[in-house]
Amino acid sequence: LKAELEDVRRTRGLHRTARRKVPFPTVALVGYTNAGKSTLFNRLTGSDVVAKDLLFATLDTTQRTIRLPQGRPAIVADTVGFISDLPHELVESFRATLEEVGEADLILHVRDIASPDSAAQARDVEAVLKQIETPVGPNGEAKTRRILEVWNKTDLLDPETRESVLGQAERLRTQGKAVAVSAWTGQGIEP
C-alpha cells in the first residue's frame, strides 16, 4: 500500500510539474466531507462526478478544465473531503490531495452553511490549510494563495436564516472573502 501511495504521489507530482508550465490558473475545491464540493464541481464544469451524502464519496482528486467568464481557461480540482480527527493511518492517503491543494492559485473552501457544525468544520479545514506549504510558481517564486469561502446549501436554510446568511455573505463578498450559493439549485452561481 505504501508503495502504491508513493507511486500515486510521484505521478501527481509529474502532473503538477507539467501544469506549472501551462499558464492556466488552478482552483481547488476543499471542505469538510459532504459540504457539496462534488456537486459544486459538477455545476461549474458540467461534469457528472459522484456526489453522494456519504463519507469519502470522493476518494481521489478529479480535475476538469473550464472557461472563465473572460474566456480564459482554468483547471478546477474536486478533492477528498476533510473530517475531524482523521485517523493516523488515513493521513498518508490524503497527502496527495493536500499536495494538489497546495499548488492551487485559488482555494474555494466549500462549507455546508446549513449544518449546525459549519463553524467547527470550517475551523478543522482551516487548520489543515495552514499546514499546507505555500505554492511555488514556475520560476521558483512563492505564489500568493487566495482562499474564498463558498457558503453552500443555502437552499436548505429556513427563509429567515437564509436572508441573514445571504446578507452576511454579501458583505463578505465585497471584500472577496465569501459567497453564498446552492450548488444543487445553481442559486448564486454566476455563469
Q: What residues fall within each predicted segment?
A:
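Electropositive phosphate-/nucleotide-binding environments in soluble metabolic enzymes
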Residues: 53, 119, 186
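Conserved C-terminal guanine-recognition region of P-loop GTPase G domains, centered on the G4
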Residues: 68-73, 94-177
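Tryptophan-centered motif/residue detector
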Residues: 41, 148-151, 191
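Short, contiguous acidic/charged loop-to-helix segments that flank catalytic cores in large enzymes
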Residues: 85-88, 113-117, 180-184
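Conserved GTPase G-domain signal focused on the G5
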Residues: 1, 36-37, 155-157, 183-191
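Conserved G1/Walker A P-loop phosphate-binding module
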Residues: 1-107
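Active-site glycine-centered loops adjacent to acidic/histidine catalytic or metal-binding residues
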Residues: 78, 152, 182
